[in-house]
């Protein structure tokens, strides 16, 4: 159980409800390893919808529970501890639908978000290109206006959920006037001109592929926000979900720690349990300390956003950077504590070792997170951190409540 000061009763209730998800989700990872990647991905969304988790990704006006970041982080931590595949598919369900929530396009939101909330539709976020990874503004996919339509042409790569998606949010260049002249469009998976051209095999299998847009004619009504607002929507989405990547890292790390505690108490060498040796105790202590520190950064960032912060750039970057790097170290120690079993195909920690690696890359590499944090620190007139502002607001609210006479 997680005991942190950032939760209220609804978060504690959700956390208690999400304990022991392994029987639901862990078999999905095994099925993906056996080649049933798409089937396992679809079943992961069905399970998440059954648990009510997909509603966490959608505003209340469209059948959701309200985009509460602490709840999303609790969900991702619990799901990731059971299955990296299920976490990936669930996370991209949110990543691909959140720009619709941000855009203010009510007609599109009504059409797509209700089906996301109940799991009938699966979303994907199509931004990365062969020459546009960390440099997202280098997008080359074009969207040319033609009457009441836009015609999209380009290639997207490493698009998670691509092979099971019902729709994509596609980012494309609508002008050469500026590097940021990018717009976002909702494109149905079966829309003429959009094709999956190549599945991409990853060290931890999940539904991911390259897609091509060739003379793909999309109604202008499917544009999210104004023309040229795509980068704002993309960065706003990544700011929100980046914190939850840190939560997923905590889930993988917590599972690695649990597996290690059990292993060192049952495994005997030189006549004693491994848990009796000082080096083993030191490793466990370091793992637990790093996990707690990561959780504090993650749920601090989530609380900050839920308390009303408009920007979460610094806090979310810190949470993702530290949590994903700490998780890598924790899982690596778990492999070491398991010895040969730790690198045997089919063992839990071997799977965790493969699943944890991508977290330091997607939604902004660790190197990019460091640049983002440094940029915030070195700004000519750095503002107080979002956490400081949120804390001041919370304190002022509490002080006002304390000043009110008792009924």
Language-model features, listed with the residues they occupy:
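N-terminal glycine-rich flavin-associated loop
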Residues: 84-107, 133
